[in-house]
Amino acid sequence: MVNIKEKLFVYLHDPPDKALKIENHEERSKKILSSGNIQYSRTDKVKQADALSSKTQRFIIRTKENKEPVIDFLGRSSGKYFHVGYPVFIHPISTEIKRYETLEKYIDLGRSNRGERFVNEFLERVSKLEGDVLKEVFEDASNKFKGEESKQWAYIWQFYPVKLKEGVKEFAKSELKLKEEEAEKFAEEFVNLPADTRFPDHAIWTHLDLTSALSVKDPTLLRIKIVPVQPFIANSRKQLDLWASSHLLSMLMYKALEVIVDKFGPEHVIYPSLRDQPFFLKFYLGENIGDEILVANLPNKALAIVSGKEAEKIEEEIKKRIRDFLLQLYREAVDWAVENGVVKVDRSEKDSMLKEAYLKIVREYFTVSITWVSLSEKEDIYQVTENAGLSDEDVKKWLKFAEKKENSRVLERIAIYPLLVKILDSLGERKVTEERFEKSEQLKGWKCHVCGENLAIFGDMYDHDNLKSLWLDEEPLCPMCLIKRYYPVWIRSKTGQKIRFESVVDVALLYKNWRKIFDEKYGKDLVSKAREVSEDFVKDNMLVDSDLYYSSTWESGLSKKLKNKKEIDEEKVKEVVDFLNAAYKEIGNPPKYYAILVMDGDDMGKVISGEVLGEISTRIHPNIRDYVEIPEAKYYSTPQVHVAISQALANFSIREVRSVVKDEGLLIYAGGDDVLAILPVDKALEVAYKIRKEFGKSFENGSLLPGWKLSAGILIVHYKHPLYDALEKARDLLNNKAKNVPGKDTLAIGLLKRSGSYYISLVGWELIRVFYNSELRKKLLEEKGGVGKRFIYHVLREVDTWPKVGIDEMLKFEVIRHIRGRNKEETKELREKIYGEIKDLLEHVRGNNEVEKVRGLFTFLKIITDAEVFP
């Protein structure tokens, strides 16, 4: 378990302010640690970790008069260092350079007024502040988690940067007399200083995390993967099942990572980053984070650094913790199902639901595959990459430089970290296959009515008719699907939170605020009339199901909603139908379509490895490039960069995605670069575009964002279409349509009509912005001047017959054919404008030739007009 004082002197071997002044930075660490009564010591642990870390950042400093070039805020040469510039931060993916403008401005001003001693005086005050904050956080952790050193350390790790930022901001306002906004920027820059000012692609906290993680005996990279994912999620009949599936998978990964955190600390988790992670904050540190906990945001794969001698024990403990959690969840689900009439058996018969055949399904459903490889063992780096089939010309150039720096080709494995991750992935996938192959057969019997995969509870004991009669809605469930149904209840009991939209109908009715408008005018009357038909239709003065807003539901299918089968008054039902139809005439028919949005970062595996990140020279501070030997080779990633990217993805998924979706729909999953959301049709494109925009940013208020490309699939589908098939089609749009476009960064949008007609268009993200601001959009929505469905229909019907060399002329002909203004002059102007806009839009449509692009654009326009996507 964690020794908190040992953790701190390893972790704070460098001060958070290191980049302010490189010289004597270790002395500042001593002062900070002394505030917590911890003695600074550069032990073998620290030396080992620092040495391993340096293996991954390989360039050779050229000396100048036996001095080293230095980049810090001291602003002058001193001792063995000669100053070449102020620090910057280089984004680990986009390589965008960010300056520390507020710090520069303040330090320049102070130096000009008070001379060189100003920086040293400033550092004295800052070091004291860092020590005071550490002492405060240390005491808070000790008081909150008495005798629990693992949790004490986790609390310090999480909140020291947070509290330090708050302290620096107050310091900037009170001591430096900065205004609120400038003080906020000052603090943001201070807590995001680079770890290495020469190679500034990761922050100081990333370096401190990695050094602490590498300080264990025989540091070993461990990979965790939980499967199945898509089949488990896809086997969802209801939106609530879908949410429960995704959230439960995140909970299982949290349980796995909990073992790592207990034993070593949260900084040992490389991916996903646990800093600010809602599951970590809520379930490990007991923080009150509100409904943030309702978003599934932990992936099914993780990487961590552990001690090699502990790896086997960790594997056993992770598997046991997940297994025990699922079994306990199932036992609670059985109690809930019996008590709430989900399954109609006496309490005395409940034990039969806990027999071994059903428990075995729970134990064996998920495969938790864990593999590991030592980072510190030495091997011939050429041989390792050759054996793994990963050696190409770019890799060989990169290895050659590593060999030159260390004067040996036999190096610690961490030197080839990105290739090691690939090797570990390959080993892990092989192990997954082997372990899933070993699963035993289930008893013969009737299958679950939701997943169709597992034996239904009592499916081996009753004939089909009697089996159905035991279950609510005649829907027999297997142990895993029963867990899904119970899981929202369990989460609410642990967090006090409940998801807002339980069905796709809830989301569909958000379209143009239809439900809000209806409820304000007719809601009370509808509830009253529904209660007259049956009390089963009303609970807490609300309709029990949102599909009761549709007159078609009242005309057929009411019996399924009755708890007790009984005759209903058809006249009363007719009154409800007539009431609804009258309301529709006033405010319009209720929306029947909703959108599924799935998104995924492009080539993220290659981003993590560094294969698509350009040359090494792009990672080095511009002012120091004349003083270092830079290999002419691709930049291959480092553990530091992996941690930095992990944090950027966490910032994106935890903060930005949630902020964009807000109350627009239901955010099911936002983990790393993946997003799954259910949205009303009129918000789907807007939300998708905003999320892509956030993903493409490198920085937001000082915090890292991915700064990369993202592709998406949007399926617009009728609320009665089977959810599992809609999910499959949405993922097909992403994985087999958008992701197959060269260069990607593509949106594949599809409209699946109730009739079965299916329309698909592939476009670039900028098309959404261009179209939204176009005259064409206005005319399509107004349906004036002939610009409408007729125009779209004629182009789509005839485009495949157009001559390949006459596309522009045919487009002009169709515009002239369909566009009319109020007079000759307006008609001419309108035709020219719309033709020009169509040409602009075609620049953002994916296709192999002009005909494909025209078809793609007009299919997009058909989807827009038919589904009324834009408000």
UniProtKB/Swiss-Prot annotation:
Binds 2 Ca(2+) per subunit, this may not be the physiological cation. Binds 4 Mn(2+) per subunit. Part of the type III-B Cmr ribonucleoprotein (RNP) complex, an elongated RNP with Cmr2 and Cmr3 as the base, with Cmr4 and Cmr5 forming a helical core along the mature crRNA (39 or 45 nt in length), while the complex is capped by Cmr6 and Cmr1. The 5' end of the crRNA is bound to Cmr2 and Cmr3, while Cmr6 and a Cmr1 subunit (Cmr1-1 or Cmr1-2) cap the 3' end of the crRNA. Pfam families: Cas10-Cmr2_palm2, Cmr2_hel_dom1, Cmr2_hel_dom2, Cmr2_N, Cmr2_Zn-bd. CRISPR (clustered regularly interspaced short palindromic repeat), is an adaptive immune system that provides protection against mobile genetic elements (viruses, transposable elements and conjugative plasmids). CRISPR clusters contain sequences complementary to antecedent mobile elements and target invading nucleic acids. CRISPR clusters are transcribed and processed into CRISPR RNA (crRNA), formerly called psiRNA (prokaryotic silencing) in this organism. Zn(2+) binds at residues 448, 451, 478, 481. Keywords: Antiviral defense, Cytoplasm, Manganese, Metal-binding, Nucleotide-binding, RNA-binding, Zinc. Changing residue 673 to N: No effect on pre-crRNA cleavage. Mn(2+) 2 binds at residues 14, 25. Mn(2+) 4 binds at residues 656, 694, 700. InterPro entries: Cas10-Cmr2_palm2, Cas10/Csm1_subtype-III-A, Cmr2-like_C, Cmr2_hel_dom1, Cmr2_N, Cmr2_Zn-bd, CRISPR-assoc_Cmr2_N, CRISPR-assoc_prot_Cmr2. It is found in: Cytoplasm. Its main location: cytoplasm. This is CRISPR system Cmr subunit Cmr2. Residues 1-215 are annotated as: Not required for target RNA cleavage. Belongs to the CRISPR system Cmr2 family. Mn(2+) 1 binds at residues 13-14. Its cofactor is Ca(2+); Mn(2+); Zn(2+). Mn(2+) 3 binds at residues 600, 673-674. It comes from Pyrococcus furiosus (strain ATCC 43587 / DSM 3638 / JCM 8422 / Vc1). GO terms for molecular function: metal ion binding; nucleotide binding; RNA binding. Gene3D superfamilies: 3.30.70.270, CRISPR-Cas system, Cmr2 subunit, D1 domain, cysteine cluster, CRISPR-Cas system, Cmr2 subunit, D2 domain, helical bundle, CRISPR-Cas system, Cmr2 subunit, D4 domain, six-helix bundle. GO terms for cellular component: cytoplasm. Residues 592-752 form the GGDEF domain. GO terms for biological process: defense response to virus.
